[in-house]
């Protein structure tokens, strides 16, 4: 629909949200749940340009009777009705769009001052995805687990730009707290995050291993060595010896 998106972190405080909405002139806000909606109510007088707040999770929202609020389900129904009346509207907007149009505002970290918004065009995002595909190609059969905020440019790069150019499936955890369990169930081919996230995951894994029975620790340590050896061959682009291929296959079954 030729809109421009901008991300705000879930952990942002009301004054930080107010600044970002004022700075970008946002007219519609998509909020996850009651907690985020309440933050917006705190700053409502400061953001008169916001016409609607769309909330996804309806839990706890029954008592909110305000035309300012729309449930995501209601927005979908309005979209279906509009589609019935104007079946070619979306296609017309797509044809009118230009690769040079701004489609996303990516905020800086704000560590040295208030965050600034970098303007990204459609061409910027697609070029980013194409360039990544040339360096580290992914296949349409691959699964990617998105568990970091879309307000971060790294997640925009993977879940939007690279997914559009590579065509792989983007999976999301049910909740932030269940990300590790969901990771095990989904078994993604690729993940992306800054080092501190990997360090946190590694720490949780090591704690669970240290608390497991002695036999489990023994098996884990042996299979970890197999994984390291296999990774070395893969990263160098060399074929694994038959014995290592067999050991890696067995480790994968475990």
Locate each region found by the language model.
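Short hydrophobic/charged patches on amphipathic alpha-helices used for structural packing
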Residues: 18, 91-94, 180
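Conserved pre-ATP/AMP-binding loop-to-beta segment of ANL
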Residues: 69-107, 114, 137-143
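A short hydrophobic/small-residue beta-strand
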Residues: 5, 28, 144, 170-171
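Conserved S/T- and glycine-rich ATP-binding loop of Class I adenylate-forming
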Residues: 29, 102, 108-111, 144, ...
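Short aromatic/basic micro-patch
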Residues: 30, 69-70, 96, 119, ...
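Structural core segment of the AMP-binding/adenylate-forming
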Residues: 3-78
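Conserved AMP-binding/adenylation subdomain of ANL enzymes
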Residues: 126-143, 150-253
């Amino acid at each position: 629909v030729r809109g421009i998106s901008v991300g705000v972190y879930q952990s942002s405080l009301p004054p930080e949200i107010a600044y970002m909405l004022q700075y970008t002139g946002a007219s519609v806000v998509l909020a996850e749940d009651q907690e985020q909606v309440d933050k917006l109510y705190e700053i409502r007088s400061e953001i008169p340009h916001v016409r609607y707040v769309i909330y996804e999770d309806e839990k706890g929202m029954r008592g909110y009777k305000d035309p300012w609020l729309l449930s995501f389900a209601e927005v979908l129904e309005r979209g279906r009705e509009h589609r019935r009346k104007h079946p070619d509207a979306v296609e017309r907007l797509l044809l009118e769009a230009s690769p040079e149009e701004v489609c996303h505002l990516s905020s800086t970290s704000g560590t040295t001052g208030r965050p600034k918004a970098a303007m990204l065009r459609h061409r910027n995002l697609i070029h980013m995805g194409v360039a990544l595909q040339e360096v580290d190609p992914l296949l349409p059969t691959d699964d990617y687990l998105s568990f970091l905020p879309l307000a971060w440019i790294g997640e925009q790069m993977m879940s939007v730009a690279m997914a559009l150019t590579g065509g792989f499936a983007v999976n999301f955890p049910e909740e932030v707290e269940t990300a590790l369990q969901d990771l095990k169930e989904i078994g993604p081919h690729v993940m992306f995050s800054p080092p501190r996230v990997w360090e946190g995951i590694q720490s949780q894994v090591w704690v669970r291993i240290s608390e497991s029975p002695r036999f489990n620790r023994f098996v884990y340590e042996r299979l970890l060595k197999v994984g390291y050896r296999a990774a070395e061959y893969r990263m160098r682009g060399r074929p694994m010896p038959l014995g290592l291929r067999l050991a890696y296959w067995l480790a994968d079954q475990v």
